[in-house]
From Swiss-Prot:
GO terms for cellular component: core TFIIH complex portion of holo TFIIH complex; nucleus; transcription factor TFIIH core complex; transcription factor TFIIH holo complex. The gene is GTF2H3. The keyword Transport does not apply. The lineage of its organism: Eukaryota, Metazoa, Chordata, Craniata, Vertebrata. Belongs to the TFB4 family. This is General transcription factor IIH subunit 3.
Amino acid sequence: MVSDEDELNLLVIIVDTNPIWWGKQALKESQFTLSKCIDAVMVLGNSHLFMNRSNKLAVIASHIQESRFLYPGKNGRLGDFFGDPGNPSSEFTPSGSKDGKYELLTAANEVIAEEIKDLMTKSDIEGQHTETLLAGSLAKALCYIHRMNKEVKDNQEMKSRILVIKAAEDSALQYMNFMNVIFAAQKQNILIDACVLDSDSGLLQQACDITGGLYLKVPQMPSLLQYLLWVFLPDQDQRSQLILPPPVHVDYRAACFCHRNLIEIGYVCSVCLSIFCNFSPICTTCETAFKISLPPVLKAKKKKLKMSS
């Protein structure tokens, strides 16, 4: 029997920091900006750490060019994660608690603010790739969870879950990688939750349904913090005791590999399982040539000539 002190709860938050989407929000003179979203993420992270002193936190920014850890930052150490004082970092030293705040929260907030500032100031939007690298961010989160599991002591147990705060639209180009990540999370018993700010995400609906997580499209973006604390702060054990939003209808249509459109009926390659909306004699993914079975050719029957009497 594992006690509460020996049970670690790791929450990995993935924030969509697509500069194009957030730039459009700024042009609309919206009350909800990226800085307010990061503030809400900080409050959620602080609340998670306050729930139990053994709770752990990681924050990843999903950008158009990279996936970067906001917390722990570049100088984060595994010793920090599991409470080993170790040697203090020479490059980054948090200012400490000046108002009686828990020092871990102060350090986390400062690291997140510093990393997001560095990420956004160095963003280069030139080029055609303007989609959020969400599949890569989820893969990075799974790798981080796997690495943390190896550091857990023998008498401890760690439960992990991933929360995705999605802003930009889905990328059909990432469909295959996204589905691979979803099934990898399911195999490791890792929940994927989704908090969608704008249009619904069919990929995240599938991810939440397959892994047993919660999917929520925020009705009002300025109220993001309230929904984060109400729906996504409780872990999987506490959710059974709460009245949460009902599950949404999941769109399980697949995206074709030729036009990236969602289809109900299509053609599947028997070698690589790629899906196409139109028939092609050669698979464009694995270049397999299909043997087309033609209908059998029937020989024409010879007409019998009538004998003249």
